[in-house]
A protein has these predicted regions:
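P-loop (Walker A) phosphate-binding loop of NTP-binding proteins
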Residues: 8
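ATP-binding Walker
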Residues: 11
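Walker A/P-loop
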Residues: 14
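Post-Walker A helix-loop "phosphate-sensing" segment adjacent to the P-loop in P-loop NTPases
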Residues: 22-29
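ATP-dependent small-molecule kinase phosphotransfer cores
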Residues: 29-88, 101-121, 127, 131-140
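Small-molecule kinase domains that catalyze NTP-dependent phosphoryl transfer to phosphate-bearing small molecules
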Residues: 117-172
């Protein structure tokens, strides 16, 4: 089974995907890291690189090709990506959403995380992060609509949509696993 995760920044999708991959003993592929690495190679923040990608679809094409290759070569895995649900239609598609203010609080708490070092400029407050998240969300929405004609937040694109705003990571994980297990049993 292939499980694809998408969701709002700060929704807990990476943490949940890691836990699901560990529980199912599936490999996990994280396209966000690929994106961060591409930004780092260009000495850019994720915000800066995101703006470049909006104008240049060839950068997204590298990620798309990799997603298609993964689906062709692997039977069971977890993938985090804005577009995996589209490129792997047979996947179990999960979207995690979160209130913007809660997302900013979560991301601010993670700013010391090594993985987020080039996420954006050094922000000093949740309000600054909130503004950055709003810009990234708008940029993502416009980018995927422009390059693919996709509304990446349209809930009908997904098999499970879960609002994580008032849930602990354990509660999110349990709800996601309950859903996945219900599909495995069929």
């Amino acid at each position: 089974m292939i499980v694809s995760f998408n969701g709002d920044h700060g929704s807990g999708k990476s943490t949940t995907a890691k836990k699901v991959a560990h529980t199912l003993n599936y490999p996990r592929f994280y396209m966000g890291q690929m994106f961060r690495d591409m930004a780092k190679e260009r000495n850019m923040t994720v915000d800066e690189f995101d703006r470049i990608c909006k104008a240049d679809a060839s950068l997204d094409k590298k990620v798309d090709d990799y997603i298609l290759k993964l689906a062709k070569e692997n039977k069971d895995f977890i993938i985090e990506s804005r577009t995996a649900w589209h490129f792997i239609p047979k996947s179990l598609k999960i979207y995690l959403k979160v209130d913007e203010r809660e997302a900013a609080e979560r991301v601010f708490k993670e700013t010391d995380n090594e993985n987020r070092k080039n996420e954006s400029k050094n922000y000093n407050s949740e309000d600054e992060i909130l503004e950055s998240l709003k810009k990234r969300k708008k940029n993502d929405d416009e980018r995927y609509l422009k390059h693919y004609g996709l509304d990446i937040r349209k809930e009908s694109n997904y098999d499970l949509v879960l609002d994580t705003t008032n849930l602990s990571i354990e509660e999110v994980f349990n709800k996601v696993m309950e859903f996945i297990n219900s599909k495995i049993e069929k």
